[in-house]
Amino acid sequence: MCDDGFDQNWHERNGGNLSYRIKHEEVESVKEELSYDGKWQPVGASVPALSGEYFMVSGSGRFMRNMILEPETNCCIIEVDQTGENYRICWGLVKGGMPTSELPTHLMNHEVKMKATEGRYRVIYHAHPANIIALTFVLPLTDEVFTRELWEMATECP
């Protein structure tokens, strides 16, 4: 997904981030690759509905382009503790670093989305498409105008 976003010019430099709530069977299939020696860190938000969940998360300050080239350096798998208040890195970021600085926001959104969709939706993807950023300089910054302009650009939304 990060590579697709890069190929479509959705990211400037290290802009944007991604988190994926990993399915339980996917966690089981890679358990032997995970380490549980990592220090618990505060999430920065309370997300009790996500207790015990695992997430693949882009690293802070990492380029989306590099996710596919060196995933073990540029992203990580984290586990949320049983209180939903802390996380630890179980895999990745082998050259150091932290998960995205947007981690609290991502996890709060995952918690809401999980409840609202009975767990169907698993990805939070934050991008900085240059063409959308450019529109902020030429359009009035109102929801109505901006949304309408974006809809009109899509051929399937006349």
Language-model segments: what does each one mean?
Residues 1-158:
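Glycine-rich flexible loops
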